[in-house]
Amino acid sequence: MEVVEGRRKTCLDVVDSPSSRQKQTIAVSLVDGKNYPTRFLNSRTIDKLKQELNTSNLSTGEMSTNETLKNAQEVAGKLLSEENEDSISEHFDEYLGADKPGISFLTRLKTLESWFQSLSLQDRLTTLRTLLHHLPSQEISTLLSSSLTSSPSNSGLSLDKSLPSSPKGDSPSLSSSLPSLTTKSNLSGNLNMVTPASTQGPAFSSKHGFSNALSTASPIPVRTSSVSSTYLTQDREASSKNCLSKALAFSSIEPPASSASTSPRNTPTPSNNGTSINANVTSSLTSNSTGKTSKTTDLLIAASKKSLPSNSTPSKPNTSFFETPHNNIWDSRDRGAFSAPPAPFFPLGFSPHLNDESSRSRWSNISYSPPPPPPPPELLNHSPKSRPLGDKPYLFYRNNQIGPRTRTEGRSSITEGKPFLSSSLRFEHVPSANDLNSVVNARVEKSTGQPSTPLNRQHYFNELPHSTTPVTLPSLIHGSEIDRRRSGFCLNNFNSTPPFQPYHYEIGSGLPQQMHATNTILTNPIDPNSNISTPVGMHLCTLPYTYQPFSSVEKIETPPNNSKNQTYRRSSRGSNKTRKSISHSKNTDKHVGNELPQDIPSWLRSLRLHKYTNNLKDTDWDALVSLSDLDLQNRGIMALGARRKLLKSFQEVAPLVSSKKMNENLKAAKNQSSESLTSFKGHTDSEDLPSGSMSNEISSNSTKQDVSSSSMD
């Protein structure tokens, strides 16, 4: 009685609240932003509704919920039948017009939505039925016909305008969708009215309050057209149901400690394969839901079975015994030799820790890694695609697998003639079989310390025999560090510029000049056992090729007559013999400057065709360049290669011959012009000769007179 009476008062107070000037009941359609024409009831209708509700409340002291809804529907039907459509639209325009110009319609819409959600269950039903009475019959039939075809579970709403009520006239779809919107209502009191009785276990129903509402939810309706506000709430309910189902499925993967300790059904048994009972309950919960949610839950349950193995079966490694673990092969770029040494390599798969007493299944006592896989065939066979190797190609393979030796470790030639182990690249001497057996037995028989595994590398390194060489800085001999990084053919050497190079100071300049290793490398022959010219860890191999980076460019000291010009060349790493052969190689496209050779015999000698000098001795450059293949055959040059080489050389020399001819023509023209100029000057001098002779005669006469006068005196 008190609950029903309190809800009626709440409904009436909220209906009074929207406007202080006029009491209005406002309704809104909340379907994805498609707002249908909203209607408002005037104050006279609301006052009549209040009076009828108060009289029905006072006359019947105790009234059930169905009877209350029935009375409300009858009162609303009577009042709305007397209303006029013009007066309602007039109040609607007045509410949206000049009354409150500063408030937008969207703000009013949000206010109405929050007001509708604050109502109780019965108040919402009453309000919605009143609004449905108020809408025109044509609009109601259009909305509800499209809605009922998409979801048959919503057939509780009648299309009749009078909406005759019955004891079973409640709308199941609306009432089942209300728990997702009702935040302040008491769910425990209304749950039996909304959904049927729960079919789940008592423990799960008490733990999860929404399980009954979720199990009877209908699928998500298909939005074929604009629908009423009832289906928006149903969509919200379905989405919240999916979210809650996923949350319950996730919670069943790792149950809390309290539920696992208190409930005896959560213990792992052979029947449930180690998973908790929540996963089974969740799968039964989502069996009535959509197919998408059930598939998601099945995937989550399968993931929980994989992520939570049974405690009774011990875990074993999946790798095979003859499969090399990745972390046991030393990375070639890892320079920390003493921090991560590799395990010794036992040929033929022999490992001393596997004796008759210990079987192969004892994975906890493994101290050594299994042997690495055999090298690829292209490393051992001299294929044209691979680089040539030395006499001992297995050294190249092991060096590629393990890495180069550090610069501070010593070398020894004891490894020749002995079985090759990986420790020969790392330690001073190769341990024999007795030493290895003693070391392994001492490690296996230890009962106090933990078994040495490949992860415990420091303990493993201290027990193996090796030489304790003090770590000192390497002495940088002239160019040794540069050549160590550049001249090796193994893949572990970097193809980059060395990090540091020695410097020297020139006399007269205070700036340090970078010194390269060309002089020391080229003047000394390659020694396969030296530290300078061989790669690190490969002192038993020969060098099939030398590597020179592109960026190393050196200056050449030119002779004194051309000291002003600075020429550059690529510094070669070969020997003097190689340089000599390069200088005398067959080079047909290099000519000194843009000038022809001195004579044809010297040019033929540079082409290695000097035996044909007699065939071409009576020919000048112009006639030589114009010779064809037939002319060369007529002159006695029958070799096809020689003819082709000569014709190609003729094409290269032809521009020089033409330029020389042009220069000669210009020079001849210049000489001719100078000769004509000198002849013209001579002709002008001969024309001026009489006046000159006359002056000479006058001067001679004057001298004669002077002489005679002097004699008379």
Swiss-Prot record:
One Gene Ontology term of the molecular function aspect: nucleotide binding
Biological-process GO terms, alphabetical: nuclear-transcribed mRNA poly(A) tail shortening; protein transport
Cellular component terms (Gene Ontology)? cytosol; P-body
Q: Where in or outside the cell is it found?
A: Cytoplasm, Cytosol; Cytoplasm, P-body
Report the residue ranges that make up the SAM domain in this protein. 595-656
Q: Which Pfam families match?
A: SAM_2 (PF07647)
Q: Which Gene3D superfamilies match?
A: Transcription Factor, Ets-1
Which SUPFAM superfamilies does the protein's record reference?
A: SAM/Pointed domain (SSF47769)
- Which keywords describe this protein according to UniProt? Cytoplasm, Nucleotide-binding, Phosphoprotein, Protein transport, RNA-binding, Transport
Q: Where is this region: Disordered?
A: 154-208, 254-336, 356-389, 554-596, 667-713
Biased region (Pro residues) positions are 369-378
Please list the residue ranges that the record marks as compositionally biased, kind Polar residues.
189-208, 258-281, 321-330, 559-569, 670-681, 703-713
Q: What are the Phosphoserine sites (modified residues) in this protein? A: 673
Q: How does it associate, per the subunit comment?
A: Monomer. Binds to RNA.
Q: Which family does it belong to?
A: Belongs to the VTS1 family.
Its function, per the record, reads: RNA-binding protein involved in post-transcriptional regulation through transcript degradation.
In its UniProt entry, what is this protein called? RNA-binding protein vts1
Q: Which organism is it from?
A: Schizosaccharomyces pombe (strain 972 / ATCC 24843)
